[in-house]
Amino acid sequence: MSISQNYMKDKLPKHIAIIMDGNGRWAKKRGMIRTEGHKKGVETLEKILKYSDKLGIKYLSVYAFSTENWKRPKLEVETILMLFNKYLKSKFNDFMEQNVRLVISGSRERLSKSLNKTINEITNKLENNTGIVLNICFNYGGRLDILESIKKTIENGEDITEDNISKNLYNSFIPNPDLLIRTGGEFRISNYMLWQIAYSEIYVSDLLWPDFDEKELDKSINSFYNRDRRYGNVEE
């Protein structure tokens, strides 16, 4: 029996953020090159997006490419960029049919003109969709997100306050994550949504991202469901 059958939907996390870790290790364990792991990871994302939508999750954020990932081997970086461009183009019709709204969080500065064009065209066409919001964090870093927000706040002539910094972050219309999932068994945040996850519940899965499935997502949500979120208050 799935989570959706066990629990009331108003008790489920509205926003799940995922650090999709383990693609390279998954490939290495199978004697493949790292890029094959990224290709398999794309398939996992499609599966988890559909299941999250089925459960009634409103927002799904995924850490696809960090500002630090440019340091990886050139072939791997080029493959990730190619896969991302291909993913956006190939999934457009599915996203439109499934009423998925796609947004991209991150810096555009190092991305090619063709990739930026694809991002702008696809996200603009999906902007009015009212279903689950898929937030792909690409060329993203939590520190950069905060830094850019502070710069924008100053440029707008606004006071440096928590509210103003929050509203000037990438895609700030998305509420803070209720649940942060990291796959691959590592207990690290890796510069992901540093501002937004201040009070998020964290679940670390030992499964590598390509092996992550609906059952494991159920386990993570079950863990969230059974926690007492106090936001700094004491238990009564």
Feature annotation, model-predicted:
Residues 1-236:
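Flexible, compositionally biased loop and terminal segments
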